[in-house]
């Protein structure tokens, strides 16, 4: 499992099976590894966002850990989610925190009639194969002045020259890029070696 987490990008069917197999222990694993990205992301969003969001789309939503933190600050927001794993989605459904849940990869177009104030992608950018396509899709989901918040691992940030990629994109302007933050500090393979940056983009 850890090797798959480190590797990230792979065949979507393998990623789906990986998360289906992990689903029963998913939340406990992240607790054990001191995973704080959802809370950290919400804090950054709350600090920099200029609107009171009415609609959120939570891509690669997992079991709703980001939404649980987000809802503490924005309890009236209507939230939809998507994930590639059916078993993960089944867990989210039981929590009854999402209006709609879509079983699909975040790199495929979601068929929703809602225009969102915020789109989130927390802890899953590792699996993105086409970043320009993703930005284009997110742009299409958002209202004018909408926000896209996501995390990216620092090792992939450097490998992909991610700063340049963001600055060259024609869909968003950068609102905030965090300093490197611990990702899974109590995971023996990640520790403090692999960190994340949290990025907030505003729709142009």
Feature names for model-found ranges:
Residues 1-24:
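N-terminal, positively charged/glycine-rich alpha-helical extensions of SAM-dependent methyltransferases
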Residues 35-52:
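Conserved alpha-helix/loop element of class I SAM-dependent methyltransferases that forms part
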Residues 57-109:
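Class I SAM-dependent methyltransferase SAM/SAH-binding core
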Residues 109-119:
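A short acidic, Gly/Pro-enriched loop at the edge of an enzyme's catalytic core
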Residues 118-131:
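A short SAM/SAH-binding and catalytic strip from SAM-dependent methyltransferases
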Residues 132-144:
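A short glycine-rich, Lys/Arg-flanked "PGG" loop and its adjoining helix->strand segment in the class I
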Residues 145-153:
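Conserved beta-strand signature within the Rossmann-like core of class I S-adenosyl-L-methionine
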Residues 173-204:
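Class I S-adenosyl-L-methionine
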């Amino acid at each position: 499992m850890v090797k798959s987490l480190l590797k990230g990008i792979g065949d979507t069917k393998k990623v789906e099976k990986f998360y289906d197999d992990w689903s029963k222990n998913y939340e406990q694993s992240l607790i054990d590894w001191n995973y704080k990205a959802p809370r950290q992301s919400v804090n950054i969003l709350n600090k920099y966002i200029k609107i009171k969001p009415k609609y959120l789309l939570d891509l690669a939503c997992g079991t709703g850990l980001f939404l649980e933190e987000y809802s503490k600050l924005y309890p009236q927001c209507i939230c939809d989610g998507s994930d590639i794993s059916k078993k993960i989605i089944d867990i989210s459904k039981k929590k009854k925190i999402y209006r709609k849940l879509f079983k699909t990869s975040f790199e495929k177009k979601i068929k929703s009639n809602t225009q969102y104030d915020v789109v989130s992608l927390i802890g899953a950018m590792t699996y993105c194969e086409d970043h320009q396509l993703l930005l284009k899709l997110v742009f299409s989901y958002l209202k004018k002045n909408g926000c896209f918040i996501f995390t990216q691992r620092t090792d992939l940030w450097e490998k992909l020259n991610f700063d340049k990629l963001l600055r060259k994109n024609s869909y968003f302007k950068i609102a905030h890029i965090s300093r490197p933050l611990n990702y899974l500090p109590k995971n023996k393979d990640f520790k403090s070696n692999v960190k994340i940056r949290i990025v907030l983009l505003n729709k142009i």
